[in-house]
């Protein structure tokens, strides 16, 4: 009977996910009960993350203290791996990795180089940033000067936000007790960094290059991605003021960019206002980058012979 109930449970979960995908595609509100349950699951995901050993521990015990213990052990393993890196850069790696949580807690979340060293030279640290990215430890999100396709053309290599590759590890590096605060939705913590970290992971996992936009005149957009031939601005809102987004409004009004749509991921159900679609944060995983099919094309050059 357990096999039958387990199979029935799997079918139900698939049905729920199919229904959520349908709501995402049609931009229709989710059943309120399902929405609340999905938000609960999302908050749990912010704590547990996706590291296999951590997920396994949670499934076995449901004990968040055990989850935290394993996460902190993984963080220590990262430090040991860093120690094996060549001695010239080990210190830089240590510093950068240690600073990620506090840098993300800053208002604009950008990695401030001067926090590493008052006499900072990007060229001196560049290999360390590359190592953290290539090792799958960190996710850089680069600033672009213009929200125009191709985004790569206006990318700044030395202006970026640096997220961790696992949101659960990020949560574990903050103060003790944060896990309960997340579950209880307490107001005195900065959920913005954790929400944005989860968003960066999902976007990267679905094949998107990670960028954000910032200008003194218009303000900052949390993420900009290339989607279906256009630039798609994404705002990640962890609080109640999810309809307040001055930078997004400025960019959408700018006729130079001709951006057709923007998405705001928040705690609320689906709604649409003009060009902006408000979506529950747990739906960010439904954004998928287009896969290019094989396209074979050849030119007959025989006439040139």
Residue ranges and their predicted role:
Residues 51, 56-228:
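Accessory nucleic acid-recognition modules appended to NTPase machines
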Residues 268-305:
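Domain-level recognition of nuclease-like catalytic cores that cleave nucleotide substrates
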Residues 1-12:
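Single conserved hydrophobic/aromatic residue that forms the stacking wall/gate
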Residues 238-279:
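Catalytic cores of nucleic-acid endonucleases
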Residues 212, 233-236:
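Short catalytic-loop micro-motif centered on adjacent basic/acidic residues
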Residues 230-232, 261:
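Structural motif
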Residues 21-74:
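Amphipathic alpha-helical "lid/sensor" segments that cap RecA-like P-loop NTPase cores
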Residues 10-36, 296-304:
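Charged, glycine/proline-rich intrinsically disordered loops and linkers
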């Amino acid at each position: 009977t357990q096999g039958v109930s387990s199979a029935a449970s799997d079918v139900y979960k698939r049905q729920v996910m199919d229904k959520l995908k349908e709501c995402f595609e049609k931009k229709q509100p989710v059943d309120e009960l399902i929405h609340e349950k999905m938000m609960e699951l999302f908050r749990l995901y912010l704590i547990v993350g996706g590291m296999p050993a951590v997920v396994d521990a949670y499934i076995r015990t449901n004990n968040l203290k055990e989850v935290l213990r394993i996460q902190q052990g993984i963080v220590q393993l990262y430090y040991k791996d860093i120690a094996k890196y060549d001695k010239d850069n080990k210190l830089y790696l240590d510093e950068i990795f240690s600073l990620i949580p506090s840098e993300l807690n800053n208002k604009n979340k950008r990695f401030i180089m001067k926090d590493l060293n008052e006499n900072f030279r990007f060229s001196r640290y560049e290999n360390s940033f590359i190592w953290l990215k290539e090792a799958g430890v960190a996710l850089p999100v680069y600033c672009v000067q213009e929200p125009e396709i191709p985004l790569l053309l206006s990318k700044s290599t030395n202006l970026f936000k640096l997220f961790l590759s696992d949101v659960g590890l990020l949560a574990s590096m903050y103060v003790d007790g944060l896990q309960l605060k997340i579950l209880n939705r307490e107001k005195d913590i900065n959920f913005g960094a954790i929400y944005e970290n989860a968003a960066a992971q999902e976007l990267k996992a679905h094949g998107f290059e990670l960028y954000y936009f910032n200008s003194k005149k218009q303000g900052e957009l949390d993420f900009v991605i290339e989607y279906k031939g256009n630039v798609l601005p994404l705002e990640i809102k962890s609080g109640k003021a999810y309809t307040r987004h001055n930078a997004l409004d400025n960019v959408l009004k700018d006729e130079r960019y001709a951006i057709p749509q923007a998405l705001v991921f928040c705690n609320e159900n689906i709604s649409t206002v003009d060009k902006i679609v408000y979506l529950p944060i747990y739906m960010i995983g439904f954004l998928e980058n287009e896969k290019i099919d094989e396209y074979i094309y050849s030119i007959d050059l025989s006439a040139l012979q």
